[in-house]
Amino acid sequence: MAIAEWRQQLESGEVSARELTDHHLARIKAVDSSVHAFLEVTADRARADADRLDEARAAGEDLPPLAGVPIAIKDNLCTKGIRTTSSSRMLESFVPPYESTVTDRLWRSGAVLIGKTNLDEFAMGGSTETSAFGPTANPWNTGYVPGGSSGGSAAAVAAGECMASLGSDTGGSIRQPASFCGVVGLKPTYGRVSRYGLVAFASSLDQVGPFATSVSDAAELLQAIAGEDPRDSTCLKAPVPNYREVLGRSVSGLRIGVVRECFDQEGIDPQVKASVLAAAELLQSLGAELVDVSCPRFNDGIATYYVIAPSEASANLARYDGVKYGFRAEDASSLASMTARSRTEGFGSEVQRRILIGTYALSAGYVDAYYRKAQQVRTLIRRDFETAFASVDVLLTPTAPSTAFAAGAHADDPLAMYLADLLTIPANLAGLPAINVPCGFDSEGLPIGVQLIGNVLEEPLLLQVAHQYEQSADVMSRRPEGAFIPV
């Protein structure tokens, strides 16, 4: 059920907010032991919030736009009075005294918090296997990963445990799991959505965005969370347009740039390539013009990212020292010993790896060769995009080089794990909006996603193209039999 359809049923009294909430809580109870999308289910709060909305409707009050919509929140977004762990032992007992801007805006819009979702520890990973509280499974096949780092949020939507969810995207952490789980995932322009209350990973790259089962529902969530926030100095002051009203517009006459570098390289699954090119051809049949585009430094993004992101992470995570809050090692012999042991015992191996990489890249004698050089390449990547957008409206690529991989497949190969974000990272480095839309299935019945990238603040155009593709392709009507999630 789409959010707009649900709102009509709520307003007519056909279905109550409590009934919808109970339906999703029952779904969580039925399937989450297999999926493990949730770290915490806020059943009592969800029912209480739903009851208040039902009372407001019965009293004839105007209902907010997301009234009664059950939403899950990635557990690196602060929720006042509700544990926020970032899936790390370091923050296992942290209960925020304040609300993140995005969650506050959702609650003001009437959304119902149904729970907090699992993620790779501190959002560092591409499979949701580095969580200190156990991995999340892909609802399409529980022997496969859901992607990451927002795998819990993607899996919860895919498994029908909530109507929509929020995640964060630093190098693909919304779009890649959306592709693996067969849902829509949107990373907005950097600064379009406030980061206040998001546990920081890499501050120049992090952005919050929605997961949903449809483009229209993703637009509804973006409408609620976008906009200026004085508590985030990087948040843009640009007015928020009406994202809903663009969905019905045609793609006729738009120029879609097919990024050559994303298709002409080894490592792209032939089934993914064929499905994404078929998506491009469908857009062409709807009146769009396909244009062959080159972004020469697109594939340099991953090396650039794995200098910049760990460098920022090493600075951001320096605050966790066992003194003021977070995990503290017991029986330390000195302050230095307590700090060292707290960080060693509180952080998992992938987080430690990235801190070490970042600290090395920022160290005296190496900062010019690594960090400053990476920033220079980042500028060149931005310029490639600027050149491309001078001649096209939207860029089209696969979201990921492959479909979901088997659980544990990359456990001993960090590089293979990092390469899963090969095609999503450049949009983060350039601060551009990008969206994943399901476009097919591989021979194993696992979803494939197409990525659309827009220019700065061109979310309306992205949503327009994505919606028109989604409506014409009707991919989910072709999903294979035997999938875990026939909701």
Curated annotation (Swiss-Prot):
Entry EC no(s): 6.3.5.7
GO terms (BP aspect): translation
Gene Ontology molecular function: ATP binding; glutaminyl-tRNA synthase (glutamine-hydrolyzing) activity
Enzyme class: ligase
Matching InterPro entries: Amidase, Amidase_CS, Amidase_dom, AS_sf, GatA
Catalysed reactions, semicolon-separated: L-glutamyl-tRNA(Gln) + L-glutamine + ATP + H2O = L-glutaminyl-tRNA(Gln) + L-glutamate + ADP + phosphate + H(+)
Annotated catalytic residues: 74, 149, 173
Keyword check for Protein biosynthesis: yes
Keywords attached to this entry: ATP-binding, Ligase, Nucleotide-binding, Protein biosynthesis
A cellular-component GO term for this protein: glutamyl-tRNA(Gln) amidotransferase complex
Top-level taxon in the UniProt lineage: Bacteria
HAMAP family: GatA
NCBIfam families: gatA
Free-text function comment from the UniProt entry: Allows the formation of correctly charged Gln-tRNA(Gln) through the transamidation of misacylated Glu-tRNA(Gln) in organisms which lack glutaminyl-tRNA synthetase. The reaction takes place in the presence of glutamine and ATP through an activated gamma-phospho-Glu-tRNA(Gln).
Similarity annotation: Belongs to the amidase family. GatA subfamily.
PANTHER family: GLUTAMYL-TRNA(GLN) AMIDOTRANSFERASE SUBUNIT A, TRANSAMIDASE
Assembly: Heterotrimer of A, B and C subunits.
Protein name, UniProt field: Glutamyl-tRNA(Gln) amidotransferase subunit A
Originating organism: Synechococcus sp. (strain CC9311)
